[in-house]
From Swiss-Prot:
Binding positions (S-adenosyl-L-methionine): 39-41, 59, 83, 100, 107
Main location per the UniProt record: cytoplasm
Full protein name: Ribosomal RNA small subunit methyltransferase H
The EC number(s) this enzyme carries: 2.1.1.199
GO MF entries: rRNA (cytosine-N4-)-methyltransferase activity
Domain of life assignment: Bacteria
UniProt record, GO biological process: rRNA base methylation
Keyword Glycosyltransferase on entry: no
Cellular component GO terms, alphabetical: cytoplasm
Span list, region Disordered: 303-334
Organism encoding this protein: Verminephrobacter eiseniae (strain EF01-2)
Presence of keyword Cytoplasm: yes
Coiled coil: none
């Protein structure tokens, strides 16, 4: 196994500043780092919290859990769970939630994890390597229609059909794909039109990673849960790194920061808005120059209001990852 690459946390100070903005000089209460990663945000939050503060972190990656276990601060605890399980925490118990979405540098730069077309390694792509199907497992059984749909839905790949047919043809002729280099070469051969400055396999790798890890569905679950677990005045801070993530976050905040209107009762709204949209922040030029991976980041900040609403029904409406994955042909355990 290769040594873990270095990870530079994007918008580290601005994100923690936004999270703790209303908390005073020695923040108490319970806070959540929903995506521990390598602990960049977690460590800064712990530096800022007062003695009565508590920080709970979530992560699916066993390597992230191992890193988190090195933190001996009694105010900190780690859960080996995806942040879609945020709703397991007590209602109204949290002073703030920080979500840093997507894949971390140690994950994408480790060939054995299979996230990148830049290195040859096993075609895995699972954030939690202890469970679930790898990308190779799924591609070994999915039909061309299922593969094409995933590439369209999660990669916005306009050559999805051609790539899917090439994957199935390769499987029938030579056996299933097992390595990242095999998939990258196959996509390069199938896609004749190049986007300037972008590897032709970029969208395919993104789509498979998002699908295998149910990333967008888990995000929807966590956002819905945030309405339930945040206390009034609690902050929601979300960092996204591509348009599919940011669209979900933007629409969620917009939907819950509008005053609902019931046509049947034109003189009164049935509930008040549940979120107050506060900010949209991009990394400055200095951060992008120091860390080019920050260039696509968008941070959105919202605050939970006093309003009560149908939080639990929102959580039920949030699309279940298993249901979405089943649509794309994955055989799920009972």
């Amino acid at each position: 196994m290769s040594s873990a690459p270095c990870h530079t946390t994007v918008l580290r100070e601005p994100a923690v500043d936004a999270l703790l903005a209303r908390a005073g000089p020695a923040p108490a209460g319970t806070w959540v780092d929903a995506t521990f990663g390598r602990g960049g945000h977690t460590r800064l939050i712990l530096c800022r919290l007062g003695p009565q503060g508590r920080l709970v972190a979530f992560d699916k990656d066993p390597e992230a859990i191992a890193e988190a276990m090195r933190i001996t601060d009694a105010r900190f605890s780690i859960r080996h769970q995806g942040f879609g399980q945020l709703g397991q925490l007590p209602a109204g118990s949290l002073a703030g939630v920080l979500m840093d979405l997507g894949v971390s540098s140690p994950q994408i730069d480790s060939p054995e994890r299979g996230f990148s077309f830049r290195f040859d390694g096993p075609l895995d792509m699972r954030m939690d390597t202890t469970r679930g199907l790898s990308a190779a497992d799924w591609l070994a059984t999915a039909d061309a229609g299922q593969i094409a749909q995933v590439l369209r839905d999660y990669g916005e790949e306009r050559f999805a059909g051609l790539i899917a047919k090439a994957i199935v043809a390769r499987r029938q002729a030579r056996g299933p794909l097992a390595r990242t280099a095999e998939l990258a070469d196959l996509v390069a051969g199938a896609v004749k039109t190049r986007e300037p400055g972008q590897n032709p396999a970029t969208r395919t790798f993104q789509a498979l990673r998002i699908f295998i890890n149910a990333e967008l569905e888990e995000l929807q679950q966590a956002l819905a849960a945030s309405l339930l677990v945040l206390q009034p005045g609690g902050r929601l801070v979300v960092l996204s790194f591509h348009s599919l993530e940011d669209r979900i976050v933007k629409q969620f905040i917009a939907r819950h920061s509008r005053q609902p209107f019931d046509r049947r009762v034109p003189f009164a709204a049935p509930q008040a808005m549940q979120l107050l949209a506060l900010a949209r922040v991009r990394p400055d030029a200095a951060e992008v120059a120091a860390n080019p991976r920050a260039r696509s980041a968008i941070m959105r900040v919202a605050e939970r209001t006093q309003a009560h609403g149908a939080e639990r029904s929102d959580m039920r409406r949030a699309e279940r990852p298993d249901a979405r994955r089943a649509e794309h042909g994955e055989v799920l355990p009972p």
